[in-house]
Amino acid sequence: MKIVSLLCSALLFSFSFAANAAPLIIKYSHVVADSTPKGQAALKFKEVAERLLPGKVEVQVFPNSQLFGDGKEMEALLLGDVQILAPSLAKFGKYTKKVQIFDLPFLFDDIDAVGRFQNSDKGGELLTSMSDKGIFGFGYIHNGMKQLSANKPLRTPRDAKGLKFRIQASDVLEAQFKAVDANPQKIAFAEVYQALQSGVVDGAENPWANIYTKKFHEVQGYITESNHGLLGYMVIANDQWWKGLPDDVKKGLSAAMAESIAYGNQVAHQEDANFRQKVIDDKKAKLVKLTNKQRAQWREAMKPVWARFEADIGKDLIDAAVAANQKPAKQKKTEKKHSDKK
């Protein structure tokens, strides 16, 4: 009887210990503000994950490079010092050349075309293209189309000649600015404001969300509405960490991630115009609108960058991205109907 009693006590203790086990800590690090689409997506992931897996997980969100800057975060992920990141798509060139497709200038007509490509089979393949490097991709978060800013108006490519532009660590972006005889400078995102303010660089490229939330428009005299490229993110995890999670935890986190990505992209779509208007209302930088002819000149000047990186990226991927610019027939009819009513 005494042995049975001891066994029962041991079982009760083990059940109690399991019930009171500390939650799995998940560190989600990023380099932008909470108010941006990526920041909002990260907070939504925390909210949904902790609701779906009560007591099992605790998501700690670190915005604004609080934990790791954009120059160190990938290394930290692979070392297991952080579990989830959402780096800019420009950061993946050293892990797979194919993701460089998102840096090609004037590839996508608008953010809807980006979404169509990313949701296609070709776009989905890129999420699993780095598993051999220890990176697991969940999905894509949009920020917006990029605008050019500088301390002088940029209307034609020759206006950029000789200017120093901050870029991310991307060979494609480096080639993009060299194509217009500008001087690209690789600078960490957290250092961009100071670099612009002090004149270390003359200009930069950013979507409206980053321009406003990081106050770049306060230290740049002009913003050219170029929509020349995409700034987006891939939400990723350490592949080994992800594969080692229990199935129920993976299921809950996958559901939370899907909801958070959809939410982040909804915020991006809604807030892009709002951030643009806020920049205009602040009246600290002048907006430069390109004519169709001027925009065509920028496109023509930067288009050779495609051919330079076609072999690395793959012509099939580039063709699929170009095809995504074709709007579905249903969308075309809806737009025509609205146009007829005007």
What kind of feature is each model-predicted range?
Residues 22-113, 121-342:
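N-terminal secretory/targeting leader peptides
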Residues 15-21:
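Sec/Tat signal peptide C-region and signal peptidase I cleavage site
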Residues 2-9:
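Sec-dependent signal peptide recognition
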Residues 1, 21-22:
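Absolute protein N-terminus
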